[in-house]
Amino acid sequence: MEFAKKIEDINFEKINSYGEMIEVSEPIVMASAAGWYVGAICKEDGFIQPYDRYTEYMTKEQAQVVLDTPEEEGGFKGHPFAEA
């Protein structure tokens, strides 16, 4: 797992996930072995792990454009968990 943003700069929000409170990140540009995408990570039991993948796989640059595009245009800027 790789991130385009430093872990300490990622914003997290506590949510109820199936009856358990966990910390889920704002949408971020991240990568797995399959490629780059916009997704979220969570903090659970002291570990950082993938939480969800919101887009298909693409280049790092394309994923950053999707993240920076306003939500009303199909991107993630303005997402409730995203930084204001």
Q: Which residues does each predicted region cover?
A:
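A short, exposed loop/beta-hairpin motif centered on an aromatic-Gly-Thr core
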Residues: D45-Q64
